[in-house]
UniProtKB/Swiss-Prot annotation:
GO terms for biological process: calcium ion transport; potassium ion transport; sensory perception of smell; sodium ion transport. Residues 274-350 are annotated as: C-linker. GO terms for molecular function: cAMP binding; intracellularly cyclic nucleotide-activated monoatomic cation channel activity; monoatomic ion channel activity. 3',5'-cyclic GMP binds at G414, S417, R430, T431. Ca(2+)-calmodulin exerts its inhibitory effect in cAMP sensitivity by binding to IQ-like motif of CNGA4 and preferably binds to the channel in the closed state. Inhibition by PIP3 of the CNG channel probably occurs via CGNA2 binding. Residues 493-547 form a coiled coil. This is Cyclic nucleotide-gated channel alpha-4. It comes from the Eukaryota. The gene is Cnga4.
Amino acid sequence: MSQDSKVKTTESTPPAPTKARKWLPVLDPSGDYYYWWLNTMVFPIMYNLIIVVCRACFPDLQHSYLVAWFVLDYTSDLLYLLDIGVRFHTGFLEQGILVVDKSMIASRYVRTWSFLLDLASLVPTDAAYVQLGPHIPTLRLNRFLRVPRLFEAFDRTETRTAYPNAFRIAKLMIYIFVVIHWNSCLYFALSRYLGFGRDAWVYPDPAQPGFERLRRQYLYSFYFSTLILTTVGDTPLPAREEEYLFMVGDFLLAVMGFATIMGSMSSVIYNMNTADAAFYPDHALVKKYMKLQHVNRRLERRVIDWYQHLQINKKMTNEVAILQHLPERLRAEVAVSVHLSTLSRVQIFQNCEASLLEELVLKLQPQTYSPGEYVCRKGDIGREMYIIREGQLAVVADDGVTQYAVLGAGLYFGEISIINIKGNMSGNRRTANIKSLGYSDLFCLSKEDLREVLSEYPQAQAVMEEKGREILLKMNKLDVNAEAAEIALQEATESRLKGLDQQLDDLQTKFARLLAELESSALKIAYRIERLEWQTREWPMPDDMGEADDEAEPGEGTSKDGEEKAGQEGPSGLE
């Protein structure tokens, strides 16, 4: 092999950075991997927020577990460092498109405040342990600068969790705990600075039995801080200026914290009520209306029981209003994932186009019937079909007691009445009484909605009508002669309509020609009128001629005046 071929072979091998990119992919900020990494970062950040300040204020805690603290400290530092690497491999949206170019990601990240805070949180301030000793955990306070990452993790979890209100309450409790924890640590540090047991306000002297234990020190400080910040108990009065300042700061913090907590709890409760109102109908107005209209107690009880069933069993009747803010395509996908399996079980909709079923799914209206309530009665005009989602319906006689059959979940009825099938002996009227045995959840599809959708799918309409004829033939409810007569009548009507359409086209053509002729005649008349107007302007009228004689200059008279003047001068000339 020649040297040139060796060079070409070497150049054709893929470079090493391409392999590295496979091992370090770009993360989608809305993806699962990024979400779980954020949740992982919660632990080192919470560790630094809670443990570092506690170790700084409780010396016994720092001295007793020094090796464990070193391991946890540098483990959290390692996670902090990895988090910076993750930030360099996390894409961002530009013009709605995820940017995966690592150079652009890095350039954008290093120009943000987040990068400066991340670097500052990793400054090795604990290197001062070499000179100051390993018992000064306050050197690690710069690790608190990574707190914005904690807030980001909480926000992502709140949007992803199935119980956002419960998570908001839990997040609020975490904030309250951290505030009380910090306050208790500062209280113990201030007591140590002022002297344990110097007065009733500071922490008691550890020389007393029981107060020397670390657990008692922390719990007493936490209890004292809870009393101050919640203002729900008697606390010893301060005796020194430092104690007064601490109490004033705590009281101000308590006022702000109380207002924040009440506002947050009110917001959570309001959101819960708003969500319930959006999902489930409010029965207060209906109850008030029934009382004002003096509805009988039995009917009022049935209405209230129906509302209670919806509320207790979390039944929704306004799915369209709930999903109205979603884009149309996304709303269709949600409806398909929820209801398509139910709709595809209906015989007349089997083997239909997927797009047709998707549009029909959006038209399904959930309905809930209470025990003993009739869904339809024999002889009623059928304007909708029903699909049983949950519950049992009975086909009963006219007396409402005798049962002929029981329909369960997944069955359907009324599908023939919403399709205009020629020769249907029952027409569009119901042929049976159907009553709900218990609480039943149904899907309703109206004839108008089906007609609106089928107007764009004529082939599917023909297929559905053919399936409906097959069903009626099996039920012996299809009059073939009547169907043939209706078909003949329809063909005759269509033929007449075609003839009328042809006549209408001919009339339109004649009318267009007549209109064109009228426009041409109008143009000719207008042209002739315009010529006459110009001619009348050029020819003088009799009155104008008399005025011209009066205003004529000497020597410029008419031919008659010239003749008279010549006749008078003739004799004189002869003389």
